A protein has these predicted regions:
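Membrane-embedded catalytic cores of phosphoryl/pyrophosphoryl-handling enzymes
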Residues: 41-147
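Core segments of transmembrane alpha-helices
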Residues: 17-29, 74-80
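Transmembrane alpha-helix boundary signature
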Residues: 1, 25-40
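Detector for Asparagine
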Residues: 3, 34-36, 93, 101
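Arginine residue identity/basic-tract feature
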Residues: 9-12, 31, 115
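N-terminal transmembrane-helix/juxtamembrane module of multi-pass inner/ER membrane proteins
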Residues: 1-19
Length: 147
């Protein structure tokens, strides 16, 4: 790695693969605990699975093109939280969850804007990161997609 910010696209791939392995091990442990705890972790497992899927797709894209991983991460978190809000609105305080989602959307804008101001990514790289992260996490959480 030539720099802490990893500006070279090909240097990101080993790190992304390491993170995928780490997320997968965490998913395996939580899946085991979930079976023993009456499936209490199910929404969080779908959240974690969405993160794994996002990272795998981002790694494949990174082979040919640089994508904004910061935008992918913050928008994925926003999409997952929106999914949790939509599936469990009766359980949680709706106003509180909307406040959290509003804050996350503002953070998503700030992070994305900062990537553009720092000139570390192009507009299209940031937009692809946002769309990919948000849509995958929202889909996984909303439709209960996991292994």
């Amino acid at each position: 790695i030539s720099n802490f910010s990893i500006p070279k696209r090909k240097q990101r791939i080993p790190i992304l693969l390491l993170v995928i392995v780490y997320y997968s091990m965490t998913y395996y442990v939580f899946r085991h605990w979930n079976n023993n705890l009456f499936h209490l972790f199910e929404p969080f497992l779908t959240f974690l699975f969405g993160g794994i899927v996002s990272l795998v797709i981002a790694t494949i894209i990174t082979i040919k093109w640089k994508i904004s991983l910061h935008a992918l991460a913050i928008s994925g978190f926003s999409g997952g939280m929106l999914g949790l809000l939509l599936i469990s609105g009766e359980v949680y305080n709706l106003q509180e969850m909307m406040a959290y989602n509003t804050i996350l959307l503002l953070l998503m804008g700030l992070v994305s804007y900062s990537r553009l101001v720092l000139k570390t990514h192009t507009y299209s790289q940031v937009i692809v990161g946002i769309v990919l992260g948000f849509s995958i996490e929202l889909s996984c959480v909303l439709f209960h997609i996991s292994l």
